Each structure stands twice: as structure tokens, then as C-alpha cells.
Amino acid sequence: MMLVVFLVSCGSKEDDQSANNSKTKTLSLKAAVPGTSQEIPTYDPDGGGWEVEKWNHKINKSLKELSSKLINDENWRIYADSMCNEFEVAIFHVPKIPKEITTGKIESFNDPEVQIRENSFSSGISTLLNSFSIFNNLERVSFKIINIDKIAKKNIQSDVIVHFAGAENNLDTELRGNIKMLWSNEKEDITLLSVKGDFSASLSSLGKFTDVTESTLGGVPEFKGQFYRGQDYWTSRIEMLTGIDVGGWQGVSVADVNGDGLDDFYIAQPGGLPNRLYIRNSEGGFEDWSKKSSINFLDSSHANLFFDIDNDGDQDLVSGVYEGIVIMENVGNGNFSKRASLLLPSAVPYSIVAADYDKDGDLDFYVCCYNRRMGSKEHHLFARPVPYHDANNGGQNVLFRNDENWSFKNVTLLEGLDQNNRKFSYAASWEDYDNDGDMDLYVANDFGRNNLYQNDSDKNESTRFKDVSEDVGVVDVGPGMSVSWGDYDNDGFPDLYVANMFSSAGHRITSQDRFHKSADKDTREQYIRHARGNSLYRNLGNGHFEDRSVLGGITVGRWAWASRFEDIDGDGFQDVYVANGFITQEDTGDL
């Protein structure tokens, strides 16, 4: 009222009457209530002076349209050639494929021995695809622009990663290429002048995996009701104070819970939704035992791990909930009873790994805690990493020693694992990488460098573990998501595979001169490395590792999360399976 009176007193006499007439209306208006919604501005590639992104926007639009037309066979030749003006040549170097492919195997061919040369873009594509018999059965096409350079006043060149995949006569084929596309930028519309590059090929006669979700779980009402709906459905219906979030960072644990010789699985869920246990039955389907087993927690849960804690021959459960760790004893036939709770006051548990690190005959466990708990400055996803490329303000991981009789002690500091322990840790894995008889620990961290803690249990030192990641060559600066050990070269020493996030945009932007112009060379290189993708480290057998990521052709795992060494085709060599992507939504443009 004081403000209204002041404003009225400042008006002229002519305004007095109108002010008085509107006074009643003004006082009757409802008070404005501040809302919680906010409008996030969309990204404009033409703004900000990033000329490279302006070009990328135009090129990417054309390549996406070409991909769609290739998949759907919608006059793609006409469109491909319409992208060109005064096209010069398409040159592709491809591997030579034998006439006979071993049945039930996956084979890779990487030597570009054969040249394909065509005078039109469309002819180059069709000849390439016909050479591998997938022209008429194309299933997937993608173009990822990783770099753009200005070649001359009127020309630009884009470096592009290309994938073609298709099937013919029970043979699945994938082509992966690194190509250079030369464009004319003389006019408003960018036009293609030439395409040159090398391709590798992978051929599989294993057959396709079959999705059995509906046949094995479709008859379970609780499964359909909870998991056939997306994350957006639940976040719009469940109060955030329960612990639900938009991230979807929940894991799956597999074990023979009821001792019948069949694997069962347990799914962690965000707050407000119960964790679910599904028991395999003799007919090949699954039954929901969540409530019956007493592990249908409603607390926010990211990770769970089954292992035999008390050495009685069955699978007990360590569950990571928002407040900390819950220890559940398997009392028989898949029924559980709570035995202990371990609070984690500084950070939220995200993943759990177990091993007998001290060789006393029982399993201990290590907990990765991604980010610190919310304080006065609350965050819905995670705290802002500082610095972004090498953050040290994440959660505090914890090692719990099993002291028998359901007693566990936090020995993180005692055993030396608090060194470099403020990272954004997603996953960890135990392995005796140096073959000295005890378990070492590798930790994959988001926003920076990873840790390899060497276990020197036989040395007379105050602490057992030491971070040797930099000394042995496995720092792996990047957005670490997962880690897997496996002897891929069959030399008797475990090698290391780390899943990170490959980013084509990151490649383009970090390589530009104007990106972090004031930063030193090492910092800029770390940002560039951050976008590279997944990593493969070969164990040299002398305590050190060699980075074989680029030579091994394994960097592009897209937005990778979980990864695992596994001999998928049974040929005696370890393959790598990588889970990637993000939250599925109705808009296909969303990750």
C-alpha cells in the first residue's frame, strides 16, 4: 500500500480520478505466486561467433537427411547429388573380404587394400554398400562430424566418422569409416566437392540377439506397470523429496538368489518406486518376489551387489540407498533379513564392488560415491565439477572391511584409499593386475583422471594401497563411466577397458584455437582427451600399460555407460560389449 500511495501522489490531477476508479480493481487482484518452471534458451549455432558450429549445423542437417533417405530408400540418389556442385571425386579404400566367412563367428577386417573411385557422390555410396552386399538391406546409417577446418577462402573440410550397418543372407555387416568431406562455402548453401576416406569392416554370422522381455516378463503386472513407463512419467507424479531424480542412474544386479541354479535379477529404482527382484522359474519366465523377499526398498537406490558375506554358500545383499548401505542376509530360498546399516554422511553410494583385499577369507566391499550430499546449495543432478576437466570436489569413496559376524569397519583412510578420493566416481573393479597374489583396484571417475590403487599387502608400510595410475600409464583423463578387466591379447596379464563419453561436438570445439585461449597446453590437451571416447590399455607385464585405444579402434562407444569383456563368439578371444545412450523420450532427437 505504501508503494501505491506514493505512485498516486506523483501523478497529475487529471490522473487522480482514474487512479481512484481503478483502486478497487487493483486491490482485488490476486497476489502473484512465484512459479518453479523456467525457460531454458535454445542453442543458436549461428550465435556466439563460433563459425565452425555454424558450418556444422548446415552440414549435419544435410547428412541427417541423407541418412534418413538411405534407410527408407526415399530418392536418396537425387538428394545425395543435390548436395553437390561441380563434384570432383569419391574415393574410398576398403578391406578385401574373403569369399567364405566362418559360421558362428565375428570377424574384423581393417586393412584398406581395395580402392573404390566414382565421379558422383551417390555412385560412391552405392558402390561402397554393394561391395559388402548391404545396399538393399541397410539398417543403420550415421555421420558424426568431429572436426571442421577452413581450407581456403571459399572451401571448408569436415572430418566425419561414418557407420553403415545391414544384413544379407544371415550375415550382419558393419562398415566404419573415417572420411574427409570437402565443401564449397562460396554461397549461402554449402555444397559438397569431394569425399575421401578409409573403411574397416566387421562381419558377424552369430545371428541377432532376440528381445525376450515381453515373453519372459510381459505376464508380470508389476513389471509392465513400473518399467514400461519412462522416467518423465514418474518424475511428474512422485514428490522429489522421496529421492526420485531425472537422471535414471540405476543399476541391475544378477545372482542365483534362491539357490535353484538359475540366475535371477534385481533392479535398483529411484526414490518412491520399489526396488524389484525377479526370480527365474522353471518355465523360463520370471516372477516378482520383491515384497516376499523383503528387499522392495522405496528409498532412492543406485546400486546393489549380491555376494556371500558370511561364507554360508548363498548370496547375501549389499544395497546402496540414499542414506548409506543396508546389509541383508539371505536366510534361505531368496528371503532376506536386515543385519546392518552403514551410514555414509558425506556422499551418496552409486556402485559397489567386492573382493577379499586383505586375504583373510571373507569378502570386503568398496563403495563408489559419485557426488557430495546436497547442502545449502541444492542440486538436482550433481554438484558442478571443479575444475571441469579434472574435478576434485566429488564424493568420498569408502572401503568397508568385513570383520565377520556382520560387522564392517570403514578402513578407507587406514588402508590408503583416501588418496585422490574426491572424484566423481561411477564404477570400480578389482583385479590382480600385477599378478602378485592380491587384489588391486581401478576406479573410473567422471570429469577427470581415474585411479589405480596398487595393493602392496606384503610390504611393511603404514598403508596398503597406493594410487599408481600416473606411474603405470592409466590415468585416462575423461568422463569415466565403467571399467572392465580382461586378457584381450591372451598373454596372461589382465588388460583394462574404460568406458567414457565420446563427443563429436567435444572434438570439434576443443580443437579450435579460440577454445580456452588463455589455458596452458596441458589443460587444453586434457579437454581434447575428455572428448576422445573409450580407452583400451594393454598390460605389458612389467607393471606398466600401453594405450592401444586408437590403434584398437575402440574409442567410439558413443555415450558409453557399462562395458564388459566377454568372448561373445567363443573363439578364445575377449570381445567388448558396451552399453550406451541416455534417457529415452518421445522426441527422437533427445538422447
Label each residue range with its predicted role.
Residues 1-6:
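Bacterial N-terminal signal peptides
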Residues 10-591:
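Acidic, glycine/proline-rich Ca2+-coordinating loop motifs
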